[in-house]
Structures are given as C-alpha cells and as structure tokens.
Design a protein with these regions (language model features):
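ATP-binding glycine-rich loop module of kinase domains
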Residues: 40-90
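Short, surface-exposed coil-to-beta transition loops
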Residues: 49-50, 107, 145-147
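Conserved structural core of kinase catalytic domains
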Residues: 60, 65-68, 85-131
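Protein kinase catalytic-loop region centered on the HRD/HxD motif
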Residues: 134-141
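Catalytic activation segment of kinase domains across protein kinase-like and atypical kinase folds
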Residues: 141-166
C-alpha cells in the first residue's frame, strides 16, 4: 500500500515541477492548481506555510521547501527526515507520518501519506500522547502541534508537520 501512494505522487510531481518553474507567488500557484483541478477533474489542495508548499490529494501530500532563508528558524523537509530517523531509532516512529524524499529535475520533493484529522481542536495534541511520547516530543523540540499539523492514524495521533526547532 505504501508504495502505491508514492508511485502516484511521483507521477504528479512533473506537473508540480512545471507549475513551480514559472510561478513564484503562492496565489499564482493556487490559481494554477485550481485550473488543473478543473481540467483533470481532481481535488488537489494547495497550502503554504513559512517555509514549505504542500500539495494535498486524497491519499498523499507532496511538500517542497521554498523559503530557504527561514528554514534554519522554522525547519524544512530535511529536518522532518532527521526527526523521523531519530524517532525510528527510539521506537517512536508511529507518532509521525513517514516522509520520503524524491529528487526530480534538480528539486527535492517530499512525499508522505495523507493523514486525516477528525474532531481536532487546536493545541490538544499533547492530551492524546502518553507520558513517554510527550517526553520524547518535548525532548526533541517538536512544536506547533495545532489541528492542521496532526491527525489520526489507526486510532492514534499522527504528527504530519514535525520539524524540530532548535
């Protein structure tokens, strides 16, 4: 199942690459994604934060870093890969959506499964963690756990935006 969403994401990345090659402002990208959705009868959602763009489909998310100046302060996708690797070593990987790097046309794209939030309230992610999980998250400086940055997988909290802030 994992490779299925990654394979589908890799097929969509050339389209994203074209859109990003001539658009540098979020509102232009959003407009192009809207036109793509109409043309292809798709429902791709475009979102952006301080350092990353996200292209969200029903079963996967593709992230790409764009604001390289702020990555040191706010974290980027490579930071998520490092956090996940440490979580794997410590047996906490189940807390995080696994992110996979895919290089295409000189740009690194990061693919993760779509995790759905159900009935999330802002800043209550910590209430859903065990003492050990909470300690690990705090020890590794994982912040910004509001309702857009976590969801539920197999009845357990799953963090989807987890760059550490040092």
């Amino acid at each position: 199942m994992r490779s299925d969403y990654i394979t589908r994401a890799k097929k969509f990345i050339p389209t994203i690459d074209i859109i990003l090659s001539y658009n540098h402002m979020p509102w232009d990208i959003e407009e192009d994604i809207h036109m793509f959705n109409q043309e292809k009868n798709r429902r791709v959602i475009f979102s952006h934060g301080l350092t990353r763009y996200a292209f969200i489909t029903s079963d996967y998310v593709i992230k790409v870093d764009y604001n390289l100046n702020d990555i040191e302060d706010f974290g980027g996708c490579e930071d998520e890969i490092e956090v996940y690797a440490q979580a794997e070593k410590d047996g906490m990987e189940y807390l995080f959506a696994k992110i996979t790097r895919y290089d295409y046309n000189g740009t690194s794209y990061y693919i993760m499964p779509r995790i759905y939030g159900i009935g999330c309230k802002d800043n209550d992610a910590y209430d859903w963690m065990t003492e050990d999980e909470l300690e690990w998250v705090q020890e590794h400086d994982i912040r910004d756990l509001h309702s857009l940055n976590y969801g539920w997988r197999k009845g357990h909290i799953c963090i989807i935006d987890y760059s550490a802030h040092g």
